[in-house]
Amino acid sequence: MVNTEETHYACGLKKEDFQTTIDGKKTDLYVLRNAKGNEVAVTNYGDAIVAIMVPDKEGKLANIIQGHDNIQEVISSPEPYLSTLIGRYGNRIAKGRFQLNGKEYKLAINNGPNSLHGGKEGFNAKVWDAVQVNDHAVVLKYISSYGEEGYTGEVEVWVAYSFSDNDELIIKYSAKTNKKTIINLTSHGFFSLAGIANPTPTIDDLECQINADFYLPIDETSIPTGEILKVAGTPFDFREPKPVGQDIDADNEQIKNGAGYDHCFVLNKKEEGELSFAARIKEPKSGRTMEVYTTEPGVQVYTHNWADGYKGQHGATFPRRSAICFEAQHFPDSPNHPYFPSVILEPCKEYTQRTIYKFGVEK
């Protein structure tokens, strides 16, 4: 049974601060707590994760994900994708155009000449139907109408967040459509393993490992060039752990194009769709670690290159490069690159994805 009387959470957030009505739909806060007393807090506006409370090597709990502490700030955030659920299409589509069955579709343009993260009002800006099924899990649903942001087909999307007693945040996605369309869902968590603060520390000393021999180079508008290049001998080689800041400002065209890291890594997979290790980070001072596992073929690594010190939960501030994102997904602009893994969803098929963020401590 869900404890509906509990109002004092370790994360310090209050349900009433997340309750409002938008276009006739109610928003709320859903707190998932495991047997250790650690927490994940989610709101059904954009499925935003607004707190992840896990201990450091001394056992001290802290929030390690960037977000806001009330619904109005979530809605008006300077970073509209801050730890939200992204769709219909995570990442960019060049010039907002793609073809399907010989017909060209034109999407909303919202990032230079391109369409980013589903358009001007993607899934991150929608109120989802939500049911907290127990103390550990919440299930959310959204129906994306035909023509929304220029996409074809009506799509029904289900997302389940669960938080295990092993400190695993498990995100399961599924979707169905009534007409052939494209889809690429992801979670855009902004992780700060040192703990959010005023100011939140940079990620320069964060030790990072990424299970990828290849990455996708981008042009000056952050669209993949179509090449798939080896990471060896480049700033993108994270096959062995190294500090994020070691090469983040390297004299490298790709680093300059992304203003740091904002690239899709092609994950090493034994077979398509397997749940496998993608990445690991460790924050040396706190000892906190996070491992990423996913069924997706790629992970977009973003190092918060455009933040300017805006405010978050409990007076925290988020300077440039104070978070890192691991957006498990299919490749950017896949509809315009036939040899990239397919993002087409047929009416007779179901889209599924699973990504796990596992938190731990290493002394």
Stretches with model-predicted labels:
Residues 2-363:
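An exposed, glycine/acidic-rich loop-and-rim segment of catalytic or binding clefts
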